[in-house]
A protein has these predicted regions:
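Alpha/beta-hydrolase fold catalytic core
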Residues: 1-31, 52-56, 93-94
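Active-site loop/oxyanion-hole signature of alpha/beta-hydrolase fold enzymes
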Residues: 8-11, 47, 52, 57-99
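Serine-hydrolase catalytic-loop signature spanning alpha/beta hydrolases and amidase-signature enzymes
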Residues: 35-45, 58
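Alpha/beta-hydrolase active-site loop signature
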Residues: 37, 63-67, 129
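Flexible "cap/lid" loop of the alpha/beta hydrolase fold
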Residues: 109-114, 120-152
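Conserved serine/cysteine hydrolase catalytic core
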Residues: 182-207
Length: 207
């Protein structure tokens, strides 16, 4: 099961605290899907604000091969849709609202086209249902080329990445995925599989 965070009344619930769903009006639930190289945690501040007055429950999802999820050898929009439908069934979601950014926006659009019975309202940020030609190769190759054995801190990684990735805000966003595990830095996004799947992610699949 993919990982997710639940925000209600401005508070974070752990994933297994699901009993309150019985009382929740599903038309007031908003699922948030992050973009490429993102994670559910990126939306934490926004989710808290949106849920603060108690009128909406926000569920931010870590998509396949991102965030707190275990890595999988495959990555595509169809597989991400399967993950989300399994999550909906697990949470007993019948009809809900979706907010998707970038890759998550395409996922939300495809979900609404493929499984319209699940979607009440749709919000899309910073993406269109088209094939994109932008070259993500330099970004992902720069991340893959980083020798993590030489990295002692995020500052070390930032200095090396700055040679090829000039935009500091972009580097800070990407470096959120650099995690210290047992004294060694590791990527929290499955870069090798993402690179292999990039053509699929840049396209808008024909249904």
């Amino acid at each position: 099961m993919i990982k997710f965070n639940i925000f209600s009344n401005g508070q974070l619930f752990v994933s297994n605290e699901l009993n309150f769903f019985i009382q929740t009006n599903q038309s007031k639930i908003l699922f948030v899907f992050h973009g490429l190289y993102g994670r559910a945690r990126n939306w934490q501040s926004m989710a808290k604000k949106l849920s603060l007055d108690g009128s909406i429950v926000v569920i931010s999802v870590d998509l396949r091969n991102h965030g707190e999820n275990l890595f999988d050898k495959d990555h595509s929009y169809s597989l991400m849709m399967e993950d989300i439908i399994k999550l909906f069934n697990y949470l007993n979601i019948k009809k809900t609202n979706l907010l998707g950014h970038s890759m998550g926006g395409k996922l939300a659009m495809l979900l609404s086209l493929t499984y319209p019975e699940f979607v009440n309202k749709l919000i899309i940020a910073d993406i269109a249902p088209i094939d994109y030609q932008d070259d993500e190769g330099e970004i992902i190759n720069s991340l893959l080329d980083l020798d993590l054995n030489l990295i002692q801190s995020r500052n070390d990684a930032d200095k090396i990445l700055s040679i090829k990735i000039v935009d500091k805000s972009l580097r800070m966003f990407l470096l959120q995925n650099l995690q210290l595990v047992n004294g060694r830095y590791e990527w929290g996004v499955n870069l090798k599989v993402i690179k292999k799947s990039m053509n699929n992610l840049k396209s808008f699949p024909i249904l």
